[in-house]
Amino acid sequence: MLGAVKMEGHEATDWSSYYGEAEAYSSVGNMNAGLSMNPMNTYMSMSAMRTSANMTASSMNMSYVNTGMSPSLTGMSPGTGAMTGMGTGVPSMASHLSPSMIPMSAQTTAMNALAPYTNINSMSPIYGQSNINRSRDPKTYRRSYTHAKPPYSYISLITMAIQQSPNKMLTLSEIYQWIMDLFPFYRQNQQRWQNSIRHSLSFNDCFLKVPRSPDKPGKGSFWTLHPDSGNMFENGCYLRRQKRFKCEKKPSLREGGGKKLSEGASSVGSAANSSSESSVGNESPHSSSSPCQEQKRSLVDMKSSQGLSPKHATSPASQAQHLLSQHHSVLSHEAQSHLKPEHHYSFNHPFSINNLMSSEQQHHHHHHHNHHHHHKMDLKAYEQVMHYSSYGSPMAGSLAMSTVTNKSGLESSPITSDTSYYQGGYSRPIMNSS
């Protein structure tokens, strides 16, 4: 066998060097090195430590001799000559193998076609690709992680931006820019989240719009935090807002005048009702009560007895009239209803779905709030739509049916004020939309 291999090799020095290196391997490995005289073949045989793998490697060499690899084989004549030499080498090699290996040598010819591709693929391309993928994974992970959506609500983002500004005031464009500078995530889909920022500014009473003063020329009004908003977030962390403050924020919800109205009305009193509506942004910040909820509750109770009864009676009797007079009644009702803040908190938009869901939310917030909310719905022309009032709860249905009769009870509770306020701000559109 060695003689035949040497004849093919033509160079004893090369053979001896290969033979010395392959000494550690089985006779098949030695045969491989001698047959191919090709560094690539030795690499393949070394990568496959088992004798069967070595045999496939040798057969692989044989199959490649005819193809493009033959020119690179040193000392082997390209073309069929090398193939014939190898053919002679394989049988002789099989004779030297142990009996158990002999059948494998017979199979080498059948393996010629498949072995080269399987071995080559397994040797470099797959491993190389896997290494490349492994090196890329951390980068892609880091990249996606740094651009992940921040765990802050839009209200938190706006509050952070305003609080970190020197003047505690920012224009809308400055708020956008601050968010984009701090959070790369918001550098994409700007139109989408900027709409949400505008909604948050408009629909949360904790944000006040401050018109530009003559000494500060420029475009756009300033936005600042309500002086009574206090610490809106738990433990100074922007991840979670305190429910209490949410109610505070929302008491004057959006309604233009109604928003700051409720706060202004509660602090100023019934006299401020008409002015508070117009004073929406400016008056409410100054006149709004810092203990919004508590002050509003007391005011609500007081005012519910004062102007609530006349206006409340009108609202259930004729919702259209109540809608017209809602602004006045709304002012008093807003001040009267501490529920109004929570109601704002519970609903994001004055639509029937939110009102329906408010029953559950109110259960969580305050039990009597359920009554308020349901009654609110009832006062709002939801009485006409029976399933709305009944949906909230049987209590809601009863309240709706007996809005006029239970007027005394309604007056005692901020429910009526809430309902009238809500009507004042939204009753007509809400009724239409619902």
Swiss-Prot record:
**Where does this protein chiefly localize?**
nucleus
Q: Which one of the record's GO molecular function terms can you name?
A: protein domain specific binding
Q: Where in the cell is it found?
A: Nucleus
CC terms in the record's Gene Ontology section: nucleus
Tissues/organs with expression: At gastrula stage, expressed in both the anterior and posterior endoderm, with endodermal expression persisting into early tailbud stages. Expression is absent in gastrula stage ectoderm. During tailbud stages, expressed in the pharyngeal region, the neural floor plate, the midbrain, hindbrain and in cranial neural crest cells. Expressed in the foregut of hatching larvae. In tadpoles, expressed in the pharyngeal pouches and in other anterior endodermal regions.
Basic and acidic residues: which segments have biased composition?
A: 249-262
Give the residue ranges for region: Disordered. 249-339, 408-434
> What does the UniProt keyword field contain?
Activator, Developmental protein, DNA-binding, Nucleus, Transcription, Transcription regulation
Q: Which InterPro entries match?
A: Fork-head_N, Fork_head_dom, Forkhead_box_C, FOX_domain-containing, TF_fork_head_CS_1, TF_fork_head_CS_2, WH-like_DNA-bd_sf, WH_DNA-bd_sf
Q: Where is the composition biased (Low complexity)?
A: 263-291, 317-333
PANTHER family recorded: FORKHEAD BOX PROTEIN, HEPATOCYTE NUCLEAR FACTOR 3-BETA
- State the function annotated in the UniProt record: Acts as a transcriptional activator during early development, limiting the extent of mesoderm formation in the gastrula. Binds to DNA via the target sequence 5'-GT[AC]AACA-3', with 5'-GTAAACA-3' being the preferred binding site.
Please state what the protein is called.
Forkhead box protein A2-A
